[in-house]
From Swiss-Prot:
This is Acetyl-coenzyme A carboxylase carboxyl transferase subunit beta, chloroplastic. One of its GO terms (molecular function) is carboxyl- or carbamoyltransferase activity. Zn(2+) binds at residues 51, 54, 70, 73. Component of the acetyl coenzyme A carboxylase (ACC) complex. Biotin carboxylase (BC) catalyzes the carboxylation of biotin on its carrier protein (BCCP) and then the CO(2) group is transferred by the transcarboxylase to acetyl-CoA to form malonyl-CoA. GO terms for biological process: fatty acid biosynthetic process; malonyl-CoA biosynthetic process. The gene is accD. It comes from Marchantia polymorpha. It is an enzyme of class 2 (transferase). NCBIfam families: accD.
């Protein structure tokens, strides 16, 4: 095939895809009820993507409909925090908290670019103020407090804003006697904030102790790809029940760092969810499309447990 023929085929194929999208959105292919089940896509970000595991080409519209699970190999691709909220929370019941809280460049940190400029860049890119969304909502009719980290915002790194929003969420859940879920997806503590980011580990752990041990309220940690560093070393592993997605990368330090420190070869796959489950570090590995139903059953079972009675049940 000549180069000119290749360009012509590419142009023609692109036109067919564009016509398909146009017809679909006008209702010629999908009915109004069917269209409501599909999430609108931003065509400026591309119509196709590649699976990180099997490298199969995936059509973005159907990938989002399938909860970002590869239809070829079942691999769970990364989701945004907004998509995860839509996955777990009943429609029309989500009430966000502390949406306007933003980070300050207290240390005046700068490497290739200033910390202030990096924050502004990711805020514009993601539409978020920082690497987590918190709020309250209902999961199959059960009121819950939910925090969802977003890896697309500076690698989901935990700074002072992330730590403060999680702390306030836990305190609210404790006062309201609500179960708590935190979906973890993070590269660890945010280096641009130094010790201010590291102290969030202790701060969050201390309020979790009140929520779990003193008030006997449920906390479920959901570990997704990737969960590493200070998040793994603190609230990521403090859940009454710890759930992971299939093949999620969960670690404190990376494989290369461990090998350089121990000066020995580390086996492949020892930091994936299945390996951690085999060694007793996880309670459940749940596929994304089953997660909401599993959480609902856990809440019902927990509410009936005699050892976990408290004054204000989250069931009416």
């Amino acid at each position: 095939m000549s180069l000119m023929n290749w360009f012509e085929d590419k142009r023609r194929f692109g036109g067919l895809i564009g016509a398909f999208i146009e017809k679909a959105t006008k209702g010629y292919i999908f009915s109004e009820r069917e269209k409501d089940r599909y999430i609108k896509i931003d065509t400026t970000k591309g119509l196709w993507t590649r699976c990180d595991n099997c490298e199969n080409m995936l059509y973005v519209r159907f990938l989002r409909q399938n909860k970002r699970i590869c239809e070829e190999c079942g691999y769970h691709l990364q989701m945004s925090s907004t998509e995860r909220i839509e996955l777990l929370i009943d429609r029309g019941t989500w009430y966000p908290m502390d949406e306007d809280m933003t980070a300050r460049d207290v240390l005046k940190f700068s490497d290739e670019d200033s910390y202030k400029n990096r924050i502004a860049f990711y805020q514009k890119r993601t539409g978020l103020t920082d690497a987590i969304q918190t709020g309250i909502g209902q999961l199959n009719g059960i009121p819950i407090a939910l925090g969802v980290m977003d890896f697309q915002f500076m690698g989901g790194s935990m700074g002072s804003v992330v730590g403060e929003k999680i702390t306030r969420l836990i305190e609210y859940a404790t006062r309201a006697s609500m179960p708590l879920i935190i979906v973890c997806s993070s590269g660890g503590a945010r280096m641009q904030e130094g010790t201010l980011s590291l102290m969030q580990m202790a701060k969050i752990s201390s309020v979790l102790q009140i929520h779990q041990a003193q008030k006997r309220l449920l906390y479920i940690a959901i570990l997704t790809y990737p969960t590493t560093g200070g998040v793994t070393a603190s609230f990521g592993m403090l859940g009454d029940i710890i759930i992971a997605e299939p093949k999620a990368y969960i670690a404190f330090a990376g494989k290369r760092v461990i090998e350089q420190t121990l000066r020995q070869k580390i086996p492949d796959g020892f930091q994936v969810a299945e390996s951690l489950f085999d060694h007793g570090l996880l309670d459940l590995i749940v596929p994304r499309n089953l997660l909401k139903g599993v959480l609902s059953e856990i809440f019902e079972l927990y509410n009936a447990a005699p050892c976990k009675k408290f004054q204000n049940s989250f069931f009416k």
